[in-house]
């Protein structure tokens, strides 16, 4: 009887390698979440993208859309992006700011973005908290707060690396905008305690870092941009200020409160675009609210002058009214994004369950029921800075009034970190125009504050090249 010769050693090793490779693929990116064909594109992308759900805390399911880097995804950093609100969708960031494709006014077509942040990074867009966009909770309970959202986002991030283990060793950056000024540092404090995540830094654009500094600075911003007359300014100085210090935040003087109500009206409800002072207001001068069929449309996200009594009374009255209410960001046209994301073919491509309600840019109930536990992010940033491990960037478009540059600059100054680079212009090369001043930057030990000249609240929308240049220098630890 002739016995078969044992297989050569190299064949056994090859088989073992194939088995290991197969096993690792089984634990890698979830095939069921991969977007096979995205409607609206003339040509499908060469990079891979995924849409599905990550497990938040409790019974929460947070929708994510993950776009791999167009340049070496295996070695590119992972960047989490969160929009704010509270209660607004991060798909706004993807489809109108810095995603690989931008939705067009027809609500059908997508065009590739030459300044997409996924040119150099793997970007994870997360709709948070539950109740926002396509995110949901099995118990349908959507009242939440800063601490719960941080924990839920943290658990979702852990779930992401479970689903995509091939990225667990990549550099991780946490980024966001607006109320992500609260979301990002509170999340970062949790992430820094998890050694399995390779956290490198965080960047927040036009963030709400301190309610007090945001309100106090906004009055100065409004006056010196010609929005308040001398009579109102003089009255504010008389009734809100003493001993060369003004309190426009929680002043109890009745005349001061009356004057601040007028400032709030001018800034937020007179027809000026609160997100970009020099941009038109989409749809024309708005009223405080409007009716669309049987729905009341509200446009105040509740982040400025929150201590004014009329602001709180107005929202509570709406909640008790029993009317159907929708929230839209002021002076912003959300029709294109809403039309696109409510297209049944798009929802199917994104693996969205059929039973979920329509997608809205912002969720009124999430916003109104949200409990704001922190009035300042001072302690969170000091904890992050004390580790001396992370690079932090706070950047602001300088014509935004929702979260103005002056308030965030005051906030960074108040952290009392060692100054390393004095305030100076930073430059961007604009084709044939050569290098131009893109804004100003000052750098402290492990934290920088930077402005983008002529940009509003959504910096990548208004100044895409400057935003991309800033983002690239931030990721690569290059001088701004």
Swiss-Prot record:
The active site is at residues 178, 400, 457. It is found in: Lysosome. PROSITE patterns: CARBOXYPEPT_SER_HIS, CARBOXYPEPT_SER_SER. Keywords: Carboxypeptidase, Disease variant, Disulfide bond, Glycoprotein, Hydrolase, Lysosome, Protease, Signal, Zymogen. Residues 1-28 form the signal peptide. Gene3D superfamilies: alpha/beta hydrolase. GO terms for biological process: intracellular protein transport; negative regulation of chaperone-mediated autophagy; proteolysis; regulation of chaperone-mediated autophagy; regulation of protein stability. It catalyses: Release of a C-terminal amino acid with broad specificity. It holds the Pfam family Peptidase_S10. Heterodimer of a 32 kDa chain and a 20 kDa chain; disulfide-linked. Protective protein appears to be essential for both the activity of beta-galactosidase and neuraminidase, it associates with these enzymes and exerts a protective function necessary for their stability and activity. This protein is also a carboxypeptidase and can deamidate tachykinins. Belongs to the peptidase S10 family. This is Lysosomal protective protein. It comes from Homo sapiens. The lineage of its organism: Eukaryota, Metazoa, Chordata, Craniata, Vertebrata. The gene is CTSA.
